[in-house]
Amino acid sequence: MSLCTSSHKDFSQLLPLQDIGCNKTEIKNSPAGVISPAPYSCNQSTLTAEHSPVYIPSSYMESRHEYSTMAFCSPAMVNYNIASNFGDPEAVAARQTSSPGALWSAPGHLSPLSLHCQSSLLYAEQPKSLWCEARPMEPVLPGSRETLKRKTNGNDCTSPIANNPGSKKDAHFCAVCSDYASGYHYGVWSCEGCKAFFKRSIQGHNDYICPATNQCTIDKNRRKSCQACRLRKCYEVGMMKCGSRRERCGYRILRSHRGAEERVHCLGRARRYSEAATRVKEILLSTVSPEQFVLTLLEAEPPHVLVSRPSKPFTEASMMMSLTKLADKELVHMIGWAKKIPGFIDLSLYDQVRLLESCWMEVLMIGLMWRSIDHPGKLIFAPDLVLDRDEGKCVEGILEIFDMLLAMTSRFRELKLQHKEYLCVKAMILLNSSMFPLSAEEPESNRKLHHLLNVVTEALVWVIAKSGIPSQQQTTRLANLLMLLSHVRHASNKGMEHLLSMKCKNVVPVYDLLLEMLNAHTLRGQRKPLATHPEFGPLEQMEPGESLRKGEPQ
């Protein structure tokens, strides 16, 4: 036999192998932990040989003997025949001794065969070599980071992940649910699911409530079971709203500081632009032709207001109720009309409010005169509310006011007042109603007001000139129209006094915008002494503005 080339005493037992026979199909009683060779039949003379080499353990190489490589495939390859007396104890002992397991080291020693096997085959599936030791597969949990590192860095051939070409040796894990992390999100390593959940929570409503005790386990399989505990764990592991990295947070803080500086710079630049825009508007207003100005006034005219006519016979309460309702509706449209006059909104808010509070009754009365100019003896308050002088007798003190209105309407009828002239006169009443000291704190607004009044006067002169009358008569007509403005103001003062008396007698309730305008007229007379005191400015005396804001049509 050519198993060894020396006569060492430990291998003298291999000599009787030539005399041992067997009529069984497999070898039994192999040492524990060693897989027996593939079964073979004694009747076969020759078996197919598997040419995978078997190596002698390193412990035997330490001795001074050299052993050749051999393959244990069949009895024919080791040049012996199995004897027929299989039941002989000596044969059994010899057969046990001749087991290939005798050439291996103790079970605690790592098999040298595994060191020479291809790592991809060992880690991908069970070893296919006939003589590889069988070891149970250890399950590797993806959620355990330490286990995965130990399996990856070690030489354990049972790990299915360590040497798998598709595995993630440098993978990071989600700090919330221990799943594979997709990146560094909101300050920690996290998966796509936890990143999206945290983003939704900080951007929307996050009033989650735990149905249990706020101690739910959050892992890969149970992360969707409780939103409250999942969000709590997100904050516990360090997820933050400011960004994904600290340096990004610092960059955003720096960017916010730069943004504040830019905003301050932009505010200063916007202020300069506003001043320049104001000068441009003044230039444009000065270049507006009278014809264009009149056309703008024509487009700004408010619509007709309807009011339910009280049932006859009229009573003092029913007539005053209809008149106050009509006045309140017209005041709303009056504010919109004033804002459409070119240059009016460029005035300060203080001047806008004071002008409206001073002339609102005059504007209402001249509108009434224009509607009644073609109806002698009638006052057309609204298309559905037409009154004559006799119907005003039911209201105490209003008959005098009716007579004044009818007289002024008759005078406008004699002058054959044109529509464009009426538009200019009404705008002049608004802008010339400054019977109060203008704001000394805003001289720019006062200058704008005077300039705007000049523009309206030029427009009225242009309208009279376009009528075709001689130039001398044009001057006379302008004077006649302007003289009527004093009568309109006198009538408005009478009307204001009458309305106040009706309110004090509780004849008619006054509400909304009309009440504010009426109160402003009353308070102006009471606060006159404050105007001379150096500590009080006009704005502190009146505090106007509510009527303009509440009365503005939406």
Curated annotation (Swiss-Prot):
Gene3D superfamilies: Erythroid Transcription Factor GATA-1, subunit A, Retinoid X Receptor. Coiled coil: none annotated. GO terms for molecular function: nuclear estrogen receptor activity; sequence-specific DNA binding; steroid binding; zinc ion binding. It is found in: Nucleus. Its main location: nucleus. Keywords: DNA-binding, Lipid-binding, Metal-binding, Nucleus, Receptor, Steroid-binding, Transcription, Transcription regulation, Zinc, Zinc-finger. Residues 174-239 bind DNA. Brain, pituitary, skeletal muscle, liver, adrenal, kidney, intestine and ovary. Residues 529-554 are annotated as: Disordered. It comes from the Eukaryota. SUPFAM superfamilies: Glucocorticoid receptor-like (DNA-binding domain), Nuclear receptor ligand-binding domain. A zinc finger (NR C4-type) spans 174-194, 210-234. Residues 25-173 are annotated as: Modulating. GO terms for cellular component: nucleus. PROSITE patterns: NR_LBD, NUCLEAR_REC_DBD_1, NUCLEAR_REC_DBD_2. Pfam families: ERbeta_N, Hormone_recep, zf-C4. Belongs to the nuclear hormone receptor family. NR3 subfamily. Binds estrogens with an affinity similar to that of ER-alpha, and activates expression of reporter genes containing estrogen response elements (ERE) in an estrogen-dependent manner. Locally synthesized estrogens may act via ER beta, in addition to ER alpha, to mediate seasonal or developmental effects on nearby song nuclei. PANTHER family: KNIRPS-RELATED PROTEIN-RELATED. This is Estrogen receptor beta. It comes from Sturnus vulgaris (Starling). The gene is ESR2.
